[in-house]
Design a protein with these regions (language model features):
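Structural signature of transmembrane alpha-helices in multi-pass secondary transporters
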Residues: 22, 51-54, 139-147
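Residue-level signature of mid-helix packing/kink "hotspots" within the transmembrane helices
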Residues: 55-63, 147-148
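Cytoplasmic helix-loop-helix junction between adjacent transmembrane helices
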Residues: 106-141
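Helix-to-loop junctions at the C-terminal end of transmembrane segments
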Residues: 61-73
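Helix-loop boundary and gating motifs at the non-cytosolic
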Residues: 7-47
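Paired small-residue
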Residues: 99-107
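Helix-breaking motifs and short loop linkers at transmembrane-helix boundaries and internal kinks
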Residues: 41, 73, 94-99
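Structural signature of the two symmetry-related core transmembrane helices
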Residues: 76-90
């Protein structure tokens, strides 16, 4: 009896995209406080508030993103949200005020919430049911690998540049 094929191109793409998403998330996480303090002279309370905006936005969008993914086409929603997620990184550099930075942080959190729900949904769709648990394990492993290398890389980049 042969196993259903799990390592399809679609699975490899979503796995790589998931790794890169979380790598970017963990890359910037440890250095945002430094950036806000250095560029905007933000205090600890303001930094905490700004960093929290992202997570709160991601939490708020998740139930709605689930509904949208069940109602509309999943792949385009995933790609648009992923594009927004990537584009916001450039917005951070261009932000000239804390208000704009907060707005970007909220949009970034919304896109992250949508991308993560969409990615989870898509990976379940493309995995054969007989290998779904194994595939989701590998999919989650991409997050852990990103968590292992992202902060270290971000802090290294901050110290060098």
């Amino acid at each position: 009896m042969s196993k259903d094929k799990m390592l399809t191109p679609s699975f490899c793409y979503i796995l790589a995209a998931n790794f890169l998403l979380f790598f970017a998330f963990y890359l910037i996480l440890p250095i945002l406080a430094f950036y806000l303090q250095e560029e905007f002279s933000a205090g600890k309370t303001m930094i905490g508030f700004i960093l929290s905006c992202y997570t709160i936005a991601a939490l708020c969008i998740r139930p709605f993103s689930g509904y949208l993914l069940d109602t509309l086409s999943r792949r385009p929603l995933y790609l648009v949200a992923y594009f927004i997620f990537i584009a916001i990184f450039g917005g951070y550099i261009l932000a000239t005020s804390l208000t704009l930075f907060i707005a970007l942080r909220i949009i970034h959190g919304l896109s992250f919430g949508m991308v993560t729900v969409a990615g989870n949904t898509i990976v379940i769709d493309i995995l054969p049911s007989s290998r779904r648990g194994e595939g989701i394990g590998y999919y989650g492993l991409a997050n852990n690998i990103a968590m292992s290398f992202g902060p270290m890389t971000g802090l290294f980049m901050h110290s060098v540049y």
